[in-house]
Amino acid sequence: SFQSPLLQDLFRAKDPSLSAAALAAYGGTLIAVSSIFNGLGRFFWGAVSDRIGRANAFRIMLATQLIVFAALIVTKNPIVFCLLICYVLLCYGGGFGTMPSFVNTVFGSTLMPAVYGAVLTAWSAAGIVGPQIIAAIKDRAPESAAAWSFAVSTGILAAGLLASLTLRDRTADIG
């Protein structure tokens, strides 16, 4: 995760006299707190999807994260940055927590194993390729790497939101 270095950069810009230890403590605290939100997201978004439907819950996660990532492009306030990152991790955990039931509800129990396998493979591939893309951006444009990374992520979220509009929850198991 590059949330800690980004937060440290924001604090350093705000107060250049902060020690490396203080900056590392701020970054470590964000990682610890945001991981709690990751865990809570599994329960929170599961409850939301039970109430409003799987596809609708994913649409809300995608749409709200699109807004959050757009805000991350321009935020300079470390506290606002932390709050936005915690929300992103709430949705990340929510994605993992609701994905099995989402796939089953949208694609049916017969297709569920194959589709869920493909989803997890894609998610894993993104976890490998995404940081490589961010590292390449950071190598080529270190001063604006965060903004570019958040902008690319915003575009990917927009594509996901548009794709989600083609899906619907099925009320009966078609499998």
Model-derived regions: residue spans:
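Cytoplasmic membrane-interface "Motif A"-like loop-to-helix N-cap segments
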Residues: D50-L62
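Hydrophobic core of transmembrane alpha-helices in multi-pass small-molecule transporters
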Residues: V80-G94
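C-terminal ends and interior cores of transmembrane alpha-helices
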Residues: T64-K76
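Intracellular juxtamembrane helix-capping segments at the cytosolic ends
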Residues: G94-F107
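A membrane-interface helix-boundary motif in multi-pass transporters
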Residues: A136-G155
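Multi-pass alpha-helical transporter architecture, strongest
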Residues: T154-G175
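Extracytoplasmic gate region of multi-pass secondary transporters
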Residues: S1-W45, P100, G130-I134
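A late C-terminal transmembrane helix in Major Facilitator Superfamily
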Residues: V106-R140
